[in-house]
């Protein structure tokens, strides 16, 4: 009986190990894409307000693709705190496969899940509840201009 118990334990252990190894594979999105991907794509956007322009390259993740599907947008950009500007979107974006990320830095374009808004960072930040959508291409100096302005976001 103890031999059978050992055999069952090994079988259960092996099955558990195989299942644990398969979990990261099932967490991947359709077509083998990693939903939390931080790799840039060829999708670029332009953000224009107050006669200033920023460009950003979007990452290959479901949330960034959902944002791109909404473009062009004419909304409002405003200051929030001392490190970002925000843009309220017309609807929430998909959060499919999102997860935490590290190496936060100024120049990140993110989506804030609780409020459903874009967060454009020009200073250091660390906050849970964000999905990184991409990075600004050539700096973020226009974000330093304080105030609230009409903003146009479009694909380029």
Across the structure, where does each feature detected by a protein language model lie?
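Short, Lys/Arg- and Gly-enriched loop/turn segments at beta-strand edges
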Residues: 117-123
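Well-ordered alpha/beta subsegment
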Residues: 135-156
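Compact, glycine-rich, soluble single-domain proteins
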Residues: 74, 81-99, 103
């Amino acid at each position: 009986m103890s031999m059978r118990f050992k055999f069952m334990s090994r079988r259960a252990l092996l099955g558990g190990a195989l299942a644990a190894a398969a979990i990261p594979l099932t967490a991947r999105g359709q077509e083998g894409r990693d939903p939390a991907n931080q790799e840039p794509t060829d999708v670029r956007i332009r953000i224009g307000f107050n006669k200033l322009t920023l460009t950003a390259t979007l990452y290959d993740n479901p949330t960034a693709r959902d944002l791109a599907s909404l473009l062009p947008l004419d909304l409002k950009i405003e200051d929030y705190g001392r490190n970002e500007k925000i843009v309220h979107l017309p609807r929430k974006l998909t959060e499919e496969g999102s997860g935490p990320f590290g190496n936060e830095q100024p120049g990140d374009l993110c989506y804030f899940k609780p409020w459903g808004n874009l967060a454009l960072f020009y200073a250091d930040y660390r906050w849970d509840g964000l999905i990184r959508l991409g990075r600004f291409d050539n700096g973020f100096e226009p974000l330093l201009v304080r105030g609230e302005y009409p903003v146009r976001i479009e694909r380029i």
